[in-house]
Amino acid sequence: MERLLLTKKKTIRVNEDTWIVLFEERIDFSPGQFVMLETPKLVRKPFVLGYWEDHTAISVQVKGKGTKWIVEEAEKIKGHGPLGNGFEKPGKGLLIISPTCLTMAEAFRKKMNVDVLVGSRTPFQIPLDHETAVGDEEFLSKLSSTGEYDWYLVSGSRGMEKVCWEHLKGKEVYFSLEEYMGCGIGACKSCAVFTKEGVKHVCTDGPIFRGDELCWS
């Protein structure tokens, strides 16, 4: 982990509320790792690392003042990272993600043999070379018709996680969890999750967990 000062290169709108933010600087990270970025007068926020147009990039869903500042106003952004356990796996995998994880998919494609399914509630405003599904009905249809893979990795909303777990139970499924966190180093304990081995923390034990490790009830 190191202190970061990132220079925003440009932003690209993905859909109604999600943007890709590209940076000038290169960061050495493993697929699935994340950074904590600082916003004015607000707590740090976690963003999974990835690539877009061969630049280090993050996907940002605008939910409030902090994420709006990153997309619209920021020129330089302080932070620290990379953080988390990352992920590398042999064989052929399927990433099932929301638009907030688009840049992560590019990091996986650089290191592993993967296909990608992107599920969104609203239409995309940029062309994608992934399989896409807009709306719950289309997403469920495409999820049910996916072929067989050696492993699966899901990153999206809690609802997406639960749907994928029900459809893929019995297979080798991993989840990159998105939980609130204030520090990224295990100090604030805000990102606790229940596992079959007890309480773990997304920032230090994850963010990637096997599906059969987690307590789903």
Swiss-Prot record:
Keyword Signal: no
Gene Ontology MF terms in the entry: 2 iron, 2 sulfur cluster binding; flavin adenine dinucleotide binding; metal ion binding
Domain of life: Bacteria
Record-linked InterPro entries: Cyt_c3_hydrogenase_gsu, Dihydroorotate_DH_ele_sf, Dihydroorotate_DH_Fe-S-bd, FNR_nucleotide-bd, PyrK_electron_transfer, Riboflavin_synthase-like_b-brl
Residues given in the record as FAD binding sites: 66-67
Cofactor note: Binds 1 [2Fe-2S] cluster per subunit.
A Gene Ontology BP annotation from the UniProt entry: 'de novo' UMP biosynthetic process
Keyword Electron transport set for record: yes
Subunit comment: Heterotetramer of 2 PyrK and 2 PyrD type B subunits.
Its job: Responsible for channeling the electrons from the oxidation of dihydroorotate from the FMN redox center in the PyrD type B subunit to the ultimate electron acceptor NAD(+).
Protein name from the UniProt record: Putative dihydroorotate dehydrogenase B (NAD(+)), electron transfer subunit
Species this protein is from: Thermotoga maritima (strain ATCC 43589 / DSM 3109 / JCM 10099 / NBRC 100826 / MSB8)
Gene for this chain: pyrK
